Amino acid sequence: MTKYIFVTGGVVSSIGKGIVAASLGRLLKNRGLKVTIQKFDPYINIDPGTMSPYQHGEVYVTDDGVETDLDLGHYERFIDINLNKYSNVTTGKIYSEVLRKERKGEYLGATVQVIPHITDALKDKIKRAATTTDSDVVITEVGGTVGDIESLPFLEALRQMKADVGSDNVMYIHTTLLPYLKAAGEMKTKPTQHSVKELRGLGIQPNMLVIRTEEPAGQGIKNKLAQFCDVAPEAVIESLDVEHIYQVPLNMQAQGMDQIVCDHLKLNAPAADMTEWSAMVDKVLNLKKTTKIALVGKYVELHDAYLSVVEALKHSGLANDTAIDIDWVNANDLTAENVASRLADADGIIVPGGFGQRGTEGKIQAIRYARENDVPMLGVCLGMQLTCIEFARHVLHLDGANSAELDPETQYPIIDIMRDQIDIEDMGGTLRLGLYPCKLKPGSKAAAAYGNQEVVQRRHRHRYEFNTKFREQFEAEGFVFSGVSPDNRLMEVVELPDKKFFVAAQYHPEYHSRPNHAEELYSAFVTAAVENAK
């Protein structure tokens, strides 16, 4: 029988529910259990694909091509699993499915209501997360906070799950903030008490509290919360601020969190062996060397817009025994006049993905600087497209070369819309999304990075591609297309072989990076940056 764990939040949002859920997932996986995890987002968007990164951080893409919340990146990196379309559910997605069924007459004339139709659809997503992955445990995080009007159908579905599958197969974990009032010199439990009261009013009694706090709460505070919130004292778990998020699973294990969960759910599983994870964390905290990477982007004010890129760089730093110092460079501020001084200290330069005109000329200046000064450079998605445009302008001397996305009237559309995208009008969910194969050129830097594999599979998120009408001109000047689709139609990876490392990929390598296994192209880039720093 599959076990279901539901993680809710109270008092404030952005309290770290995703990290708590991911940490628990890692602990249970290391006990030998098969774990999957999903995020319920109460917003009305179908998915975050059309949302501004300033609103929601990065968009994370799954193997099966679903645009999802950035928390799924945490889940995959912590637990080292690949999630699917059932791992991110929004209000918009559920309501659109229910309304589509109503239009088809599938409800046989019934009045369509929140209960049972919306809640049944939500429960179906929870159960499908289990059946499609054959998991022992499903962890479901509910976004937002208890008391939000948008969350009510989600919480009702969670309440009903207990009756559907039995109390021994369901566990509710509530995460809250434990504020410290400096003037009073004490921690305040009242916000947590009220949050639990609100949750209980909706029919859910939490079995465990996870309290986010800057300082240790002490047993007295835990006993007080246990008494007022009707949970066992040992089931009040502290989520202390830490130097690195990968410390959280170890802190949770030290408090017996996973054992309490297993006892409640009657899971007979051996203790989690966290030796390898602990060694990884110890290494992260004791890196002696530092490598400076300039990240040239348009959303640099919000670091979460590049969360997977940052994590992939850190993983690659770990693989190369170096800490990564990220220099956040606003592409809007880069010009031909200041690019050299602004990037002079960079050991390597990364130009990540993005959409739209703003910042593209600054990114092109950064790419040109990297090429002309032989600074290791990695381009990703739009970064790959701009790498091609920079080469066209300054090596092939195709003045005005551009992307048809950025300049529909350009004489030299180096980047053009994909053929199967021409007649698509909707923006959301219509990009080339998900896992696709890439055939690597033997002897190339890309092939070397991937251990000379013939084909790799990586996740994509784009609508435009390199215009192959210009391929011969590029190749005549030493530009190498080192990764292509199996049918040779799409140019996936480009590079200049005479440089230390000047490689750009149309796909998003960062989605495949894990703390214990850095993504190979990122790792090769960081290796080159480390060498460049010497």
From Swiss-Prot:
InterPro entries named in the record: Class_I_gatase-like, CTP_synthase, CTP_synthase_N, GATASE, GATase1_CTP_Synthase, P-loop_NTPase
GO cellular component entries: cytosol
Binding-site residues for Mg(2+), renumbered to this chain: 71, 141
Alphabetized Gene3D superfamilies for the sequence: 3.40.50.880, P-loop containing nucleotide triphosphate hydrolases (3.40.50.300)
Assigned EC number: 6.3.4.2
One MF annotation (Gene Ontology) recorded for this entry: ATP binding
Spans annotated as Amidoligase domain: 1-267
Any GO BP: 'de novo' CTP biosynthetic process
Keyword Chloroplast: no
Binding-site residues for ATP, renumbered to this chain: 14-19, 71
UniProt entry keywords in alphabetical sequence: ATP-binding, Glutamine amidotransferase, Ligase, Magnesium, Metal-binding, Nucleotide-binding, Pyrimidine biosynthesis
Catalysed transformations (reactions): UTP + L-glutamine + ATP + H2O = CTP + L-glutamate + ADP + phosphate + 2 H(+); L-glutamine + H2O = L-glutamate + NH4(+); UTP + NH4(+) + ATP = CTP + ADP + phosphate + 2 H(+)
Positions annotated to bind UTP: 13, 188-193, 224
Positions of the catalytic residues: 381, 508, 510
Residue positions binding L-glutamine: 54, 354, 382-385, 405, 463
Stretches assigned to the Glutamine amidotransferase type-1 domain: 292-534
A Pfam family this chain is assigned to: GATase
Activity modulation: Allosterically activated by GTP, when glutamine is the substrate; GTP has no effect on the reaction when ammonia is the substrate. The allosteric effector GTP functions by stabilizing the protein conformation that binds the tetrahedral intermediate(s) formed during glutamine hydrolysis. Inhibited by the product CTP, via allosteric rather than competitive inhibition.
Pathway: Pyrimidine metabolism; CTP biosynthesis via de novo pathway; CTP from UDP: step 2/2
Family: Belongs to the CTP synthase family.
Summary of the function given for this chain in its UniProt record: Catalyzes the ATP-dependent amination of UTP to CTP with either L-glutamine or ammonia as the source of nitrogen. Regulates intracellular CTP levels through interactions with the four ribonucleotide triphosphates.
Name of this protein: CTP synthase
Gene this protein is translated from: pyrG
